[in-house]
Structure formats: C-alpha cells, structure tokens
Amino acid sequence: MRDLPLTSLALVLSALGALLGTEALRAEEPAVGTSGLIFREDLDWPPGSPQEPLCLVALGGDSNGSSSPLRVVGALSAYEQAFLGAVQRARWGPRDLATFGVCNTGDRQAALPSLRRLGAWLRDPGGQRLVVLHLEEVTWEPTPSLRFQEPPPGGAGPPELALLVLYPGPGPEVTVTRAGLPGAQSLCPSRDTRYLVLAVDRPAGAWRGSGLALTLQPRGEDSRLSTARLQALLFGDDHRCFTRMTPALLLLPRSEPAPLPAHGQLDTVPFPPPRPSAELEESPPSADPFLETLTRLVRALRVPPARASAPRLALDPDALAGFPQGLVNLSDPAALERLLDGEEPLLLLLRPTAATTGDPAPLHDPTSAPWATALARRVAAELQAAAAELRSLPGLPPATAPLLARLLALCPGGPGGLGDPLRALLLLKALQGLRVEWRGRDPRGPGRAQRSAGATAADGPCALRELSVDLRAERSVLIPETYQANNCQGVCGWPQSDRNPRYGNHVVLLLKMQVRGAALARPPCCVPTAYAGKLLISLSEERISAHHVPNMVATECGCR
C-alpha cells in the first residue's frame, strides 16, 4: 500500500472511512475529542454578525470559554488540529525542530520564522480567522503539482501568512524550489519528524491552473526523486485508516479592524458627516445649449432606481490622458463607420479654451470634412431609431421626452441640416448607452437572450465567470461537495464578441443587425462553447464508485 499512487482507490478508501465514521489519526498523535469544539451559543456574539461557515476550536484549556478559541474557516481534520497544537506547544528546541523537519538553524529557513509567527498567533488569536484548504487534485508528471480548494469569498486576498503542511513518510533531505515559494527551502525529515512545512508567498497559484508545482532535489545527490519516493515522502501513511495523509494549505488573512463585542452589546460610533467637496458641486451651465441639454438628459436617466440623486463624477483630463487611447480621425468617414458599428462608450473632450470661454467653438465644422451622403443618412436613421426605442422603454422620468425632443431639434443630423454632424454622432452614442442600461431595468423580467443583450451591461463583454455549484443536494455524490463549474455572463455586442476564436459568421451578422436597430426575436446570448470533465465519487447500489463525468465545467464562452 506504501508504493501505490494517489488514485481513485485511495480516494474511495478515504470516502469510505468518512462514511463509516472512522477517525483519521496517526498512531503517535494524541486523540482529539469533542472537548476541543466550541459552539456558537457558548460565546457572546455581536448582534447582526454574519452567519459564516466558522468552526471554533480550543487547542488548550477547557471548552467553557475561558481560553481564546480559534476561528477556523474550512474543514479542520484531526491532522490539522494536531499540527496546530504542536506549533502552539513548541519552544523551538532541538526536539521541536526535529518534529517539524527543520534543518540546522544556521541554514536559511523560510518556514521557521513563519512557524514562530503562527505559534504566537495561536497563543493570542485576537479574533483573526484561519483558513484551511484541503488538497483537491495532484499530478506527478513532469513535476509534482498540488491543487487545493479555492478559498471562500473574501479569503482569496494576499494573506499575512501561508503555510503548506505535509504529513511525511520516510525520505531523504531535500531542497524544494518553484514559483510561489520565497526562494529555496530545505526539508530534513528524520525518525522524529511528524510534519514538514513550506512557506508560500504567492498562495493564489495553489488553487488556480494546475496548482502549486514543486521541484524536490535530494541534498547531496544529482538525480531526482522517483514518483514512488515522492509519494512516500509527501503523502505519509496513516496505518489506522489504511490510507495516505494529504497536505493542507493554511492561510492567515490580514487582520482587519472590527468592533469588539462586550457581553452581547456592540459600541458603535456614527460616521462623521461628509465634508463639502468642490468636485461634487453643480457645474455652471454650459453656454452651448446642445451640451447643456444632453448633460441634463444623461443625468436624468443615469440616476439609479433606488436613490433620488447621485453624486456627479468629475473627469480629470490629465488622468484620462494616462489611459490607453486610440487615435480616430473624425474627418474620415471610414473611422466614423467603425464607431457606428459598435456600442462602446465614446468620450469627447473639448479644448480647455472652448470649455472656459463664453462662446465655445463648435465640435466640428461640417464643411471641413468629406461627409458622404450615405453616412449622414445612416447617422440620422440610427439616431431616430435609438430615440424611438428609448421613448418606448417603461419607467422613464417625465423629463425624458421634452429633453430628447429638444436635442433632436438642435441636432438634425441630415447632410443638409444646420446641425453639426459630430453632434449627431455624440447624441447617438449617448442614446445607445442609455438604451442598453434601461433595457436591463425592464421590470417584465427579460429572458436569457435579453439579459445577455442588455441587462448584464455592467458586467462587461461576454466572458467566463466563476460559479461554485453545491453538490450536497445530490445525495448520491460523495466527493466533491462543491466544485467550480463556472458560467458565461456578459454583453453580446459588436465588436467585443468576436474576441472568442470560436465565433461564427451567423452571430456576427446578428450582432450587426442588432446594432443597426433591427428587432430580433432572440438576440445573441452569452453561452458556454467548451467544457471539461470532472471526477465524481458517488454511492450507487451500496457501492462506492469513481467515474469521470464529461461536460461538468465551462471553460470557454461565446455568443450564439
């Protein structure tokens, strides 16, 4: 059993042990009973505290609340509980160094300072949480890669401390290197070693991609360890449960200031009133009636439904100059055609002299650009279509209709009209953005295609999003309880959606029709275009089986 790889047989035995209620303890470790567990009602919790998946564990003292319990996020097995108890009791003499496989203190030991910090924290947690992540997948070729569970929401930030804990078997002294570790680290297992610890400075790679890749080189040897020796060293045997002990990743998130409860009562201090800011004051009315009316329309329609007013965001031209920009020749009809083909936001900045003087220059002189008749007609047609669709949307403020009528009067948009053609383009882009936003506010509840077309505009273009699926409702599935299934969400709009190499000409034509204002019974929607399988361990007919289920994880998205 020592030389067997970590296959589905070992996973089945582990699941069977959990199913039968066996206790996964090493023979030399002290048994941990229920006296180390503390329930929520044993402590004073502040009112309104979130009900989070916390486990309160007391490593020392009794369980009546006299000692500070540990707030653990994740499943804390007997292995991790015994490890934390050993760190708490350690005084870092020669015996403790041998217990944790630490080499001579004269060598560079990245894990020893981290172990000391963890021990100091265990003696005074101060309400800080400890996140425990268990191994989810391991690959041995070409190098050992350990992929762990993804931390819960809010626990994926840069931690204050990250330790990879191994429960080793027999093996030589090794030097471990790889990305994610703060330099080379030495491990010196001996007969008295119960744990091996590696300090991790970039733990996010442990649950992304293939996981945390490790390169183990025996000290004093040129050859690398074989797979069998690696398995024996990294996955020690649990002789009681006839299985191997898998590593764990311990994260200590950075502490955040929080109010302290006092016997169920919470002292609160009101926030100071906001100070008046010059940036939030109303700007003086513009001397240009078109720009002034357009500003009033955008402000009227951009107010969120849940608030009566919203602060105005001041744009800093100097800061905007630092963003990636694309040069567009507004005198070129071909460039304007590209702008008309998409609904991406458009920002035009007036010259400083035009913005401060009382008589600003027009945005563009229609006689100085070779405007084609067909292009001007298209701008006028799309402008009228966008205005008509915006008027038909439900729930618009009463001021929308007169403001829109005034803008159309100030901006005829025709080739022979008195208005500036660039004003027509600016008004069209503004109406397109407002139309997309108000589509998402339709109380009639849009379907999937409608959600993809407008209701998810705040999410950006169609892309792969993280989605965790809970399998505990499926009683036949034992492992995993939850997994990352992913989902596709976002806007299907031209030209963003052609970034996926799997897009087809059919959806491109539909997107262009949608941009031109054509009514589609089913607009293009954001859906998965590629999937990956997942290994599931299930119980069927009183037997435990492991099988690979296809199409369980969405890996790519596109518009269809």
From Swiss-Prot:
Subcellular location: Secreted
Expressed in which tissues: In ovaries, AMH is detected in granulosa cells of early growing follicles.
Entry's induction text: Plasma AMH levels in polycystic ovary syndrome (PCOS) patients are two- to threefold higher than in women with normal ovaries.
Cysteine-cysteine disulfides: C462-C526, C488-C557, C492-C559
Effect of Q484S: Little effect on AMH signaling
Site (Cleavage): R451, S452
Protein name: Muellerian-inhibiting factor
Record GO biological process: anti-Mullerian hormone receptor signaling pathway; cell-cell signaling; gonadal mesoderm development; Leydig cell differentiation; Mullerian duct regression; negative regulation of ovarian follicle development; ovarian follicle development; positive regulation of gene expression
SUPFAM superfamilies: Cystine-knot cytokines
Disease linked to the protein: Persistent Muellerian duct syndrome 1: A form of male pseudohermaphroditism characterized by a failure of Muellerian duct regression in otherwise normal males.
Signal sequence, start to end: 1-24
SMART domains the record matches: TGFB (SM00204)
GO cellular component, one term: extracellular region
Gene source species: Homo sapiens
